[in-house]
From Swiss-Prot:
Belongs to the complex I subunit 3 family. InterPro entries: NADH_UbQ/plastoQ_OxRdtase_su3, NDAH_ubi_oxred_su3_sf. This is NADH-ubiquinone oxidoreductase chain 3. One of its GO terms (cellular component) is NADH dehydrogenase complex. The gene is ND3. One of its GO terms (molecular function) is NADH dehydrogenase (ubiquinone) activity. It catalyses: a ubiquinone + NADH + 5 H(+)(in) = a ubiquinol + NAD(+) + 4 H(+)(out). It comes from Ascaris suum. The keyword Nucleus does not apply.
Amino acid sequence: MLVLVMVVLFTLVLLFVFYIGNFVLSCKDFYKNKISSFECGFVSIGKIQNSFSIHFFIMMLMFVIFDLEVVMFLGILVSDLNSLISFFMLLMFIFGGFYMEWWYGKLVWLI
């Protein structure tokens, strides 16, 4: 138990030393370009500082939703034969959502 406490304390001290060292040794140029976020090639300096592309947001949302649905597929595939109906309902939901996004033109990449 004492060894575990010593390891945790050593890790916290080392983390604190690295944090303070980074703060002391870092470059202190506070220009407007330095402190603004880089948004995948978009210039975010102007009247609106929170500019972002809605297409990036939609693609991220699609990735999260379809990634979660793949995880649900894995759970359904290892269960019994009675879950075949729920598997096809989930598959129909995925294809329906994908078709709806294609129909509304949200899959067209515009910058």
